[in-house]
Structure formats: C-alpha cells, structure tokens
C-alpha cells in the first residue's frame, strides 16, 4: 500500500477477548428462561450451535440454532452431505456442542435411523437391568417415565453409580434423546429420498428436517427436484421446465407421519411449535424449512434474507402448515 503500509494489519485483541469471555462466563440469561416457547423466550437460551462458517444471511442456520435451543443436551443430529455438513463440520472449527455426525447424500436417513436403533438398544439394556431391582424407588421412577426428559434428568442425578457400576457406562442414555436427521433438498428430494421414504414408513419416533433452499447450493447452484417451475440458477440458467416435487404431500400419503412446512422468516413461533410437536409425536415426522440462499440472487442482498422469506409465504409462494395425525 501507500507509504509502505500494509492494507491489512493484524493487532492484538486481548482486551476484547477478556470482555467476550466475561460475557460468556457470566451469562444470566437462563433466569429469564421459560417453558413457554416463544421467539423472545427461546432467544435467552444459549444455543448449542454457534459461530458457524455459513454464508452471511444464510437461511438454514436459524433453523439449526433454534433446534439446539429447544432440545439442548438431549439432541442428536445425523447430517447429510451439503452446505449444512460444510459449515457444520469443517476443520478446525465445529459449531455444535451436541452429538453431531455427518454421512453421505445417499444414506444419511438410514444412518440416522441406525443411530436411533443403537440408542434404543442401550436404553433397552438399562430397562432390563432396572427391572431386576423392583424395590428400588429411583429405578421404578425411571421405568414409569423413561421417555419423560425432566423426570429422567432427575433420575440421572439420583442414581448411585457406585452401587450400580453397570449403569455408569450407559448413563448418557438414561435421559431420552431427540434424534434428528438433517439435510438439504438435494438430499431429501433427490439423492437420499429412498432413505427418507424408508424411515417414514416405520413407526419409530424419529425426526427429519429438510433445509429447503430449492437449489443445489453447496455445488454452486444447480436445479433440484425442489426447484420451482421456471426457476433459474447459476448452472441452470435456462430455467426449470417442470414442477417442484411436493414432498410434504407425498409424506402425508403415510397416515401415521407428522408433517410440517415452516418458514422462520414468516412465523418463528409456528416453527417452534412444529419442533415440539414433531419430537413429542410417537412416530416419524418430517419438517420442511424454507431457507433463502445466496444462490437465489436476492437483489437487496442477503442481509434481507428473512424479510425475503416473509414475502415468499405472504404471497403464497411457500405455504406453511402443521399436520398432526394424532
């Protein structure tokens, strides 16, 4: 640069580091917390997904942030290949502080289903062990409420692990887990759809979240089965010549599947309700989440991605609903 000075000069940031650490360690937000799920209350909870490397204004990350705020430590995520696996697991940074693992496009649904079966096997072993002690009040409390998060959390603290070393190795499974299969529309509508269909056909309590950008985002912008009629993208400039696959309607062909279509930019409370309903529903569930993307070419810029998402539902382009078979 001019005068021999560098255009970018690195300086010490120790003073700000101390201030930042103070804010993290002296977090008093929890006292404002409430079991009532609203946008305000949920914002006071410390998320288990922070500082990702996603694009500025990414429409996917708010869904994941709120997912971790709702389910906290009992959340387990199986993530498909795509944008969410890149900003979710790029070395050396890792934005999650809950169990998270990534698999391929074509087998992530089966991968997540396998994790759920592994968790259930561990919990069945705990159940079998506790049944051998019918007079133990703590064990009886767990056996009668083994799917109740709050009560199981109490039991977790009350168990004498010195007397029962067998449970010490499996204590992480005493509290029930909320299992989520997460991926984009490339995974859910296209490459991994066969796995999605297989999981939805079962009766297990498993949840699927589709981060629907309506385009192959991570690979630079190609049309997917989620792209709408006439939609253009960087590598599909001629426009799509057929219609968007109606994944929600297909899922509802199974009468036992919980289905929701959400747009956090339009109504965050509706999304939060869908999360709780899906997790508490005793069966498979799928939530399709409209996610504005840098590949959409929003003229006002990605800082307006959420207001753009609001308009998508306001004009009827993306419909939101919750369908609960129960």
PLM features: residue spans?
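Iron-sulfur cluster-binding cysteine motifs and their immediate structural context
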Residues: 1-16, 23, 62, 194
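Generic beta-strand/beta-sheet core signal
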Residues: 1-6, 11-13, 78-80, 182-183, ...
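Acidic, Ser/Thr-rich peripheral helices and adjacent loops at domain boundaries
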Residues: 22-34, 95-104, 223-245, 303-320
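Conserved thiamine diphosphate
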Residues: 41-46, 50-54, 109-137, 173-175, ...
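Thiamine diphosphate
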Residues: 60-66, 70-76, 86-95, 157-222, ...
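Catalytic alpha/large subunits of respiratory electron-transfer oxidoreductases
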Residues: 61-155
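Glycine/aspartate-rich loop-and-adjacent alpha/beta segment that forms the canonical ThDP
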Residues: 92-99, 272-326
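Residues forming the flavin
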Residues: 190, 198-206, 210-226, 231-247, ...
């Amino acid at each position: 640069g001019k005068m021999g000075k560098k255009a970018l000069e690195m300086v010490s940031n120790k003073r700000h580091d101390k201030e930042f650490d103070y804010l993290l360690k002296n977090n008093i937000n929890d006292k404002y917390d409430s079991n009532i799920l609203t946008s305000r209350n949920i914002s006071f909870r410390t998320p288990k997904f922070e500082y990702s490397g996603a694009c500025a204004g990414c429409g996917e990350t708010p869904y994941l942030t709120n997912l971790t705020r709702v389910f906290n430590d009992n959340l387990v995520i199986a993530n498909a290949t795509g944008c969410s696996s890149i900003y979710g697991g790029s070395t050396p940074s890792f934005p999650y502080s809950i169990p998270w693992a990534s698999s391929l496009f074509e087998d992530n649904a089966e991968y997540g289903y396998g994790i759920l079966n592994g968790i259930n096997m561990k919990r069945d072993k705990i159940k079998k062990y506790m049944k051998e002690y019918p007079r133990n009040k703590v064990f009886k409390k767990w056996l009668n409420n083994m799917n109740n998060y709050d009560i199981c959390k109490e039991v977790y603290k009350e168990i004498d692990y010195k007397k029962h070393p067998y449970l010490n190795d499996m204590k992480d499974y005493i509290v029930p887990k909320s299992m989520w299969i997460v991926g984009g529309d490339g995974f859910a509508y296209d490459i991994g759809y066969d796995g999605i269909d297989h999981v939805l056909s079962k009766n297990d309590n498993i949840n699927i979240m589709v981060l629907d950008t309506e385009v192959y985002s991570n690979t630079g912008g190609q049309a997917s089965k989620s792209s709408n009629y006439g939609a253009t993208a960087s590598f599909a400039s001629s426009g799509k010549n057929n219609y968007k696959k109606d994944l929600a309607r297909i899922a509802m062909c199974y009468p036992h599947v919980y289905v929701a279509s959400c747009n956090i930019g339009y109504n965050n409370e509706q999304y939060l309700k869908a999360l709780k309903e899906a997790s508490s529903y005793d069966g498979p569930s799928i939530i399709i989440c409209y996610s504005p993307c840098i590949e959409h070419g929003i003229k006002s810029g990605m800082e307006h991605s959420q207001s753009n998402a609001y308009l998508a539902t306001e004009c009827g382009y993306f419909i939101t609903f919750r369908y609960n078979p129960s």
